[in-house]
Amino acid sequence: MVEQGDAAPLLRWAEGPAVSVPQDPALQAGGWVRGGSGEGRVAAEAPRRREPDEPAPPEVLLQPGRLELGDVEEDQVVAVFVVTFDPRSGNMVEWCLPQDIDLEGVEFKSMASGSHKVQSDFIYFRKGPFFGLACFANMPVESELERGARMKSVGILSPSYTLLYRYMHFLENQVRHQLEMPGHYSHLAAFYEDKKGVLHAGPGRGGSLPPVYWLPSIHRYMYPEMKITHPAGCMSQFIKFFGEQILILWKFALLRKRILIFSPPPVGVVCYRVYCCCCLANVSLPGIGGTIPESKPFFYVNVADIESLEVEVSYVACTTEKIFEEKRELYDVYVDNQNVKTHHDHLQPLLKINSADREKYRRLNEQRQMLLYSQEVEGDYSPCEEDLFVLFFLEQNNRIFQTLLEVSASQDKTLTAEHARGMGLDPQGDRSFLMDLLEAYGIDVMLVIDNPCCP
């Protein structure tokens, strides 16, 4: 079997089978409606009818900060644009549709700092109420005016980051086209006319665009739709890159800490690490997460985002700008390639890998090897490795919160070392993590695990 390295191009996106979405009256009206602790845009469409011999999918729900409902959401491309690097003026928006849309800052988001060092890249980012995907390319030219290199990005904006992947190949082709034939926008204009979305204004919104809301991790839709939200190989590479440290990231993600990942370009694969990090914190138990902010994938950020990051209490993002490391007020956890660190004293214990972490990592790898073996020998690629990764952490998180909820509902509300071991945690090594978890989620239990440092 040939394994793909972390720096290798990710495999093409793979879609799973269509999923039937249970309807309730709040969802059938379409437009922007409230759901759980947030809001989201849903399309008014009847659920897909399941064939007689088709088993019902398990009712598990995962997506962190999801804004779309899988196969029932229509295309919603709200802008298409071309960004160029001008040797005299710097990054600038060369062309866009619609012409009156606010694209301030997109010229820097879609062409990451340091991009001149790579030949091509792709970048996910957030712009106000939208998410963007841009494909960048750098072509040598014999032009003194352009200083020997022509650099452009072609991108789109959408209310949902989970649908952007559909247009990756188109954007890659179009940025090459723009490099070779600058100023020819007919294909992009036709694409926008075909895919443009109309955002419905709800009561009291007038004609203004709705703000972004983050749906809770717990809702009714089905796991198989998750398969369209990431490229094949994404989470496998995530595990290989971080190794046992994914358990450290898991704890910080579950605590909804502000996580900033630094890496030099190319930034595309780092955007996938942002997404994978958010997936570590999925929970499908009712009653969990109502008092804690959602894990927000901001994807690529730069110095222009500092003001917006200052007011965020929870996010996962990546950057190519080393200056962020000095701005400690903006993050709780800083990841420099594979080095995970925090400047908060009370979070320092979470940086240590303990015996329970090693056991979880061993089990994860054991399950991965069994899956890969069955795929090779039996040719069975369902479930895939990505399913295994997401469900592994979902099960772990559910086990923790199920235990905590049961203890909080008991008469004495006492959480013991035996409970900790039953949750797959180290009673001493994870004591600080458990205390932070109880506080963050507002769970009323009494922790009676002795602190080995305080006899």
UniProtKB/Swiss-Prot annotation:
Residues bearing the modification Omega-N-methylarginine: R41
uDENN domain boundaries: 15-187
Domain dDENN: 364-455
Keywords for this protein: Acetylation, Guanine-nucleotide releasing factor, Methylation
Residues that bear N-acetylvaline: V2
Family statement: Belongs to the DENND11 family.
Name this polypeptide is given: DENN domain-containing protein 11
Source organism: Mus musculus
Organism lineage: Eukaryota, Metazoa, Chordata, Craniata, Vertebrata
Record gene name: Dennd11
